[in-house]
């Protein structure tokens, strides 16, 4: 079989996906990959850290379940799942189980963490040490920081919140330089050319690695205590073009504050709320926004995070079955989102880099920068059987594979993968050679410090043999 060296390259606009928040539980990456057919650049998970509170480390909605609450953010601290790392933390629990799951499936961790701005340098250092093994991850600390709903904004002034961000960033960079920090704040003040709380957050804009805003084309922020109706007011729907233009204007102002020097710009939460629009206008407005991104020759937006995979309300590709939280009910937006994912503008590239010979050392840097191999597979027509068997040293390999536009995961210990789902919709009508692309993310989800000086940002795996392939084009009988 002919094999080639390959390289993963960034999308023009990366797609990340929210997976778990105050509005829904984390869904494992095997399920999401099977539903969507390809991985994301990153997966955003949301946690909180309020170690001085008497309710800590319980989830606050469970600790205060008998309290009369009429707004999602009225609890003593934010109702995300507790971050159980830090000083004397437990790395066998959350969020680390989720982080390892995400990375094993060839995606980057995007950790959103709301944090008491009064935590000590020692506590920040402990969190930074937690994040060292997880490669090129991103940390979105105290997002929507110019708002007034999260608990951290009620415990400090905006200047103190901004100064805390800078303090956290500087400590993190000394201990975990593999982690990029995302500053997520408001856009331009209405009627102004300055961003919200610009004086307070100017230094943070300069210090951070990545700029970000959150944008909902429509939103029922009264959920789950108020149903959005025509005669009540805790919901909104915005003009899609105005949201796009306003986000771009915020990016340009961030760049001006930074002395004209560019940085990545993200939308860290993006969707239209089906509670306001219903399922069909939700599709129309999301697709409209994506068309604005594609049509803009300035290519200023580095990526966005679709919020989220499974939601207890109507902000999900699936909504949670109220009878069983392990069950998701697919929404029409899921099919539309798959079309966006499969648009070349929004998916990473795979470039061929010349011939290869076994053994080959594969390098996993990130979903936008990794080296793999491709096996040429000659197809007479659409197969009836398309299989791979992983024997010998390959049995324990952790692999992400792509064929005919669809991705597959092989966990350590798995010896068989069925590729036929790649040919259910993408049928082959004439003889064709396709490539089976193989990459090797970290088998444990963590990088290995024994692998060399660049272990913080790269993971290596040597392939000594190829899988045994079975492609047949007629039924057995």
PLM segments and residue spans:
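Active-site groove signature of glycoside hydrolases
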Residues: 128-158, 181-188
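Beta-strand-rich ligand-recognition modules
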Residues: 396-464
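Glycoside hydrolase catalytic-domain groove-lining segments
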Residues: 78, 216-276
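N-terminal carbohydrate-binding/catalytic regions of secreted carbohydrate-active enzymes
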Residues: 16-133, 285, 292-298, 309-312, ...
């Amino acid at each position: 079989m002919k094999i080639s060296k390959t390289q993963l390259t960034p999308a023009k606009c990366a797609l990340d996906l929210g997976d778990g928040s105050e509005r829904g539980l984390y869904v494992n990456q095997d399920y999401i990959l099977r539903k969507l057919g390809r991985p994301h650049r990153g997966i955003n998970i949301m946690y909180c850290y309020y170690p001085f509170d008497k309710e800590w480390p319980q989830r606050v909605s469970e600790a205060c379940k008998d309290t009369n609450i009429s707004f999602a953010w009225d609890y003593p601290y934010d109702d995300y799942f507790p971050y159980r790392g830090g000083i004397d933390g437990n790395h066998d629990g959350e969020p680390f189980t989720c982080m390892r799951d995400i990375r094993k499936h060839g995606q980057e961790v995007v950790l959103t963490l709301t944090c008491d701005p009064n935590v000590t340098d020692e506590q920040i250092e402990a969190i930074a040490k937690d994040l060292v093994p997880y490669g090129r991850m991103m940390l979105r600390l105290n997002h929507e920081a110019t708002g007034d709903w999260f608990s951290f904004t009620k415990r400090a002034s905006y200047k103190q919140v901004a100064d805390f961000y800078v303090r956290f960033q500087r400590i993190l960079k000394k201990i975990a330089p593999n982690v990029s920090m995302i500053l997520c704040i408001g856009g331009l003040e209405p009627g102004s050319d300055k961003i919200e709380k610009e004086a307070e957050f100017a230094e943070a804009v300069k210090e951070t690695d990545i700029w970000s805003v959150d944008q909902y084309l429509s939103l029922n922020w009264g959920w789950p205590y108020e149903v959005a109706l025509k005669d009540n007011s805790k919901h909104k729907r915005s003009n899609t073009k105005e949201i796009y233009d306003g986000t771009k204007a915020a990016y340009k102002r961030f760049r001006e504050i930074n002395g004209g020097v560019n940085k990545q710009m993200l939308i860290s939460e993006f969707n239209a709320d089906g509670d306001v629009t219903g399922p069909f206008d939700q599709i129309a407005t999301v697709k409209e926004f994506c068309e604005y991104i594609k049509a803009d020759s300035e290519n200023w937006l580095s990526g966005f995070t679709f919020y989220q995979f499974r939601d207890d309300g109507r902000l999900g590709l699936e909504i949670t079955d109220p009878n069983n939280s392990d069950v998701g009910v697919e929404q029409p937006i899921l099919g539309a989102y798959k079309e966006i994912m499969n648009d070349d503008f929004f998916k990473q590239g795979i470039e061929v880099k010349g011939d290869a010979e076994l053994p080959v050392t594969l390098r996993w840097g990130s979903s936008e920068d990794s080296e793999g191999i491709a096996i040429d597979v000659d197809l007479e027509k659409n197969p009836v059987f398309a299989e791979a068997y992983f024997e010998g040293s390959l049995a324990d390999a952790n692999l992400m594979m792509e064929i005919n536009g669809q991705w597959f995961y092989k966990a350590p210990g798995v010896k068989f993968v069925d590729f036929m789902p790649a040919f259910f919709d993408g049928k082959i009508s004439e003889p064709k050679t396709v490539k089976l692309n193989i990459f090797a993310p970290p088998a444990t989800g963590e990088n290995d410090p024994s692998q060399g000086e660049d272990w913080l940002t790269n993971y290596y795996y040597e392939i000594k043999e190829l899988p045994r392939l079975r492609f047949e084009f007629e039924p057995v009988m």
